[in-house]
Amino acid sequence: GAYYSYLIKMPDGTRVPPHFHGMTENVNVISGTLLVGIGDTMNVSKMTPLTAGAIVSIPAGLHHYAMSKGATVIEVSGLGPDTLTPVH
């Protein structure tokens, strides 16, 4: 597939419900804090904070979710086409 990259600006408290992708997704936290979790149900108490400079690679098919803490900007990249499938 072709390489893609895009920025997402997330206001404080933005929630991204459980979902998965057909391809590996790379996330680079540009500013703010992104809370991330793995599983089929969003559980804020089990989320891991990623701060500016953190880079994670999320394997294809892994059920995950996220939430911003404060205004947050992330860069998402990978080899497309990117697909997003909700868990529920």
Regions found by a protein language model. Name each.
Residues 11-14, 21-41:
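Glycine- and acidic-residue-biased ligand/ion/polar-headgroup-sensing regions
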Residues 1-4, 47, 88:
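A short, N-terminal "cap"/entry segment at the start of jelly-roll beta-barrel domains
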Residues 3-5, 22-24, 61, 69:
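Extracytoplasmic
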Residues 11, 34, 40-61:
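Short acidic-glycine-tyrosine-enriched beta hairpin
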Residues 16-18, 36-37, 58, 63-69:
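Short beta-strand His + acidic residue motifs that chelate non-heme Fe in jelly-roll/DSBH
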Residues 45, 65-88:
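Double-stranded beta-helix
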Residues 1-17:
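A short glycine-rich, His/Asp/Glu-containing loop-to-beta-strand
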